[in-house]
Amino acid sequence: MEDDSLYLGGEWQFNHFSKLTSSRPDAAFAEIQRTSLPEKSPLSCETRVDLCDDLAPVARQLAPREKLPLSSRRPAAVGAGLQNMGNTCYVNASLQCLTYTPPLANYMLSREHSQTCHRHKGCMLCTMQAHITRALHNPGHVIQPSQALAAGFHRGKQEDAHEFLMFTVDAMEKACLPGHKQV
């Protein structure tokens, strides 16, 4: 169960999460500042890039630019560790990167997708939300990643971390597309 104090001003706050989960009350917090995007950056939501007339316009935006903080406050303490379930270090490395990406963590902690998803089982966003929520609520502990996250990969065989990361991000993107079959 998530702490209601994480829900500030109508949205879940990853930036404030570390204050609540530190195993030591006197833990030092390090603020990591990232450069924000310029107003007319190629990555800016306001910028329109017409690369091809055949492309459909964007039907849905996951989050407005102002909801994507590029800075975070994290405790100096170690976060949740992931158990290696037999050559799954490629999964663990990718999951750690995704879990500690502030915009993604904010979106997952908001539960915005799972509140409207009609296919919780088999939905990569719902599966990833469960993992990120569990990882952020268990700092300093070792947790076992869900087997559903690596369902498309061979168990007991070493795989490529980049390939797994691309598979996961692609499956999460497809889960956001209206009318697309869940992966």
Swiss-Prot record:
The signal peptide stretch is none
What GO CC annotations are associated with the protein?
A: endoplasmic reticulum; nucleus
Question: The organism sits in which domain of life?
Answer: Eukaryota
Keyword Transit peptide in record: no
User: Where primarily located?
Assistant: nucleus
In terms of Pfam families, this protein maps to: UCH (PF00443)
What GO annotations for molecular function exist for this entry? cysteine-type deubiquitinase activity
Its Gene Ontology biological processes? protein deubiquitination
Positions in coiled-coil regions = none
Q: Which residues form the USP domain?
A: 80-183
Q: Where in the cell is it found?
A: Nucleus; Endoplasmic reticulum
Query: What are the protein's UniProt keywords?
Result: Endoplasmic reticulum, Nucleus
Family membership, please give it: Belongs to the peptidase C19 family. USP17 subfamily.
What protein name does the entry list? Ubiquitin carboxyl-terminal hydrolase 17-like protein 23
Per the UniProt record, the lineage of the source organism begins with:
Eukaryota, Metazoa, Chordata, Craniata, Vertebrata
